[in-house]
Amino acid sequence: MADNFNFELVSPERLLLSEQVIDVVIPASEGEMTVMAHHAPTMTTIKPGVVKVHSASGKKQDYVVFGGFADILPTGCTLLAESAIPVEDLNQDELTRRINAAKAELEDAEHHEHKSRLEHFIMELTHLSGSIQKD
């Protein structure tokens, strides 16, 4: 049986989740990363994507995050999201609004680095939109 560890998902608005979990899959900037108890200490950036939580009670929950940071320790993981919402609460119109806002910002961007970051962000949001569309 796998050991449990504490996982916290925090957005600027509120603490979305704080509980004992078996594992968490996070959309790290380097790729999807599964975090379990006794994980090596790691700090990573989070790209827009889905966080998959497998709680110690057996319940599985998915959250959409729009970037942030994860602080991973052997005893726990804290994900500080720029914005986060349970997948079932995600409105496709809201995701489309975020994509359009990023495109508008891209049109006004003057520096190459800023344009590059926005293009990457738009690509990630578009991929996210396609991967979570509801039937």
UniProtKB/Swiss-Prot annotation:
<comment type="subunit">
    <text>F-type ATPases have 2 components, CF(1) - the catalytic core - and CF(0) - the membrane proton channel. CF(1) has five subunits: alpha(3), beta(3), gamma(1), delta(1), epsilon(1). CF(0) has three main subunits: a, b and c.</text>
</comment>
<dbReference type="InterPro" id="IPR020546">
    <property type="entry name" value="ATP_synth_F1_dsu/esu_N"/>
</dbReference>
<dbReference type="GO" id="GO:0005886">
    <property type="term" value="C:plasma membrane"/>
</dbReference>
<keyword id="KW-0997">Cell inner membrane</keyword>
<keyword id="KW-1003">Cell membrane</keyword>
<keyword id="KW-0375">Hydrogen ion transport</keyword>
<dbReference type="Pfam" id="PF02823">
    <property type="entry name" value="ATP-synt_DE_N"/>
</dbReference>
<comment type="similarity">
    <text>Belongs to the ATPase epsilon chain family.</text>
</comment>
<protein>
    <recommendedName>
        <fullName>ATP synthase epsilon chain</fullName>
    </recommendedName>
</protein>
<dbReference type="GO" id="GO:0046933">
    <property type="term" value="F:proton-transporting ATP synthase activity, rotational mechanism"/>
</dbReference>
<keyword id="KW-0472">Membrane</keyword>
<dbReference type="InterPro" id="IPR001469">
    <property type="entry name" value="ATP_synth_F1_dsu/esu"/>
</dbReference>
<keyword id="KW-0406">Ion transport</keyword>
<keyword id="KW-0813">Transport</keyword>
<dbReference type="GO" id="GO:0005524">
    <property type="term" value="F:ATP binding"/>
</dbReference>
<comment type="function">
    <text>Produces ATP from ADP in the presence of a proton gradient across the membrane.</text>
</comment>
<dbReference type="InterPro" id="IPR036771">
    <property type="entry name" value="ATPsynth_dsu/esu_N"/>
</dbReference>
<dbReference type="GO" id="GO:0045259">
    <property type="term" value="C:proton-transporting ATP synthase complex"/>
</dbReference>
<keyword id="KW-0066">ATP synthesis</keyword>
<keyword id="KW-0139">CF(1)</keyword>
